[in-house]
């Protein structure tokens, strides 16, 4: 017979068991060659240009005009702008202050012209992001994002519907950003 203490311990271990679950985007088109898209993605300092874009009223107006109204409200865009302005970029990391505290995404693997792999640092949630690029045509590349998140069963069930949207949201964003020289 198993004692109550042992049963509670086993239940506690089961509840805290974390597994990596992967979520994958659809395939998106980048209007740049595979090499150009990779070059833009592999050095995260290039994303510093986002700060300038969000600070320029003309570019903000252009962004608002080209976003579907049901995706991002002007208020949400202002919130995003505020977050982007606080971000810090190095060649290998993007750091941001979040509601959970400072969080970073760091490049841990680069496979020239094909893959950039990032992992979270200083985050309460372990996550990995794989961005894959494949030549699609003379001046286009195909882009796919896979996000792996390490969560316990109960937390995963609570946030899964939101996490499932993340790869497509990120892939759509990257396909637009990487298309711009």
What are these regions (language model features)?
Residues 2-88:
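Hydrophobic ligand-binding cavity/cleft-lining segments
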Residues 34-36, 93, 102, 111-113, ...:
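Residues that cap or initiate secondary-structure elements
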Residues 37-41, 47, 107, 118, ...:
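Hydrophobic pocket/interface hotspot
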Residues 45, 163, 167-179:
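Short amphipathic alpha-helical signal-transduction/dimerization elements
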Residues 117-168:
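Beta-strand/loop substructures that line and gate deep hydrophobic ligand-binding cavities in soluble
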């Amino acid at each position: 017979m198993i004692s109550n203490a042992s049963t509670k311990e086993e239940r506690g271990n089961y509840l805290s068991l974390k597994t990596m679950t992967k979520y994958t985007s659809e395939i998106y088109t980048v209007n740049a060659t595979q090499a150009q898209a990779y070059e833009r993605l592999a050095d995260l300092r290039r994303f510093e240009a986002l700060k300038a874009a969000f600070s320029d009223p003309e570019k903000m107006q252009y962004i608002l005009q080209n976003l579907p109204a049901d995706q991002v409200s002007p208020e949400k865009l202002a919130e995003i702008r505020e977050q982007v302005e606080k971000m810090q970029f190095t060649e290998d990391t993007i750091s941001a202050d979040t509601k959970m505290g400072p969080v970073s995404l760091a490049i841990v693997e680069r496979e020239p012209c094909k893959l950039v792999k990032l992992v979270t640092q200083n985050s309460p949630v372990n996550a990995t992001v794989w961005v894959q690029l494949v030549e699609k045509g003379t001046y286009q590349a195909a882009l796919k994002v896979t996000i792996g998140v390490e969560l316990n069963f109960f937390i995963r069930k609570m946030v899964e519907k939101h996490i499932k949207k993340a790869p497509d949201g990120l892939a759509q964003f990257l396909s637009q950003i990487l298309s711009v020289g």
